[in-house]
Amino acid sequence: YSSAASDVYKRQVWGIGCDATNSEAVEKVFRLKQRPDHKAMIVLVSSADEAARYVRDFPEIAYDLIEFSEKPLTIVYDHGVLLAPQLLGPDGSVGIRVTNEAFSNALCRRLRRPLVSTSANLSGQPAAAVFSDISEEILDGVDYVVDYRRDDMRRSTPSTVMKLSSDGEFKVLRP
């Protein structure tokens, strides 16, 4: 991805993504979505081992939580590293999901980088569950729109979100 690249792709809902290690690309996504700086975006990776590269003191229990989760799972870790600073919370935390969705997983593997993952909508507007829900403003503002699953009318449920501390203690934030 170039410094300002972002694209639109289907995951649980239609999303905007970019290289999560590239501050300029991440900033472009914030501007496009008109999203306040304090509202974090999550990071997608292709495997638990890849997630561990972007977390200081990756808890061992995370491997089991990821492997045995029955639905998409976003884990908020205490200390993100090697990512664009805009993706870290004020306390240094970061939300990371190992994506099982075929396209986004393949994209992470192919690029060998984590991806920002945020819904393809303006901040405060409903998420785009189907391609036709995406506003022209979003479509015109990205560098590329993936030609994949545009006719997919299935509506998916959001991921489970949990906070997982370095010591292995966890709390479910969204079931």
Residue ranges and their predicted role:
Residues Y1-A5, Y9:
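Single conserved hydrophobic/aromatic residue that forms the stacking wall/gate
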Residues K10, V29, I75, C108, ...:
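Residue-level signal for inorganic ion chemistry
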Residues V13-T74:
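A phosphate-binding glycine/aspartate-rich beta-alpha loop in the early core of alpha/beta enzymes
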Residues I16, P90-R97, T118-A128:
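Flexible, glycine/proline-enriched loop segments at strand-loop-helix junctions
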Residues Q34-P36, I66-S69, Q86-G89, L107-R109, ...:
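Solvent-exposed alpha-helices and their adjacent loops that cap or buttress functional pockets
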Residues D49-R53, V81-Q86, G168-K171:
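Short helix-loop capping/hinge motifs at secondary-structure junctions, enriched
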Residues P72-L115:
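Internal catalytic-core helix/loop-beta-alpha segment
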Residues A127-P175:
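Oxyanion/phosphate-interacting regions
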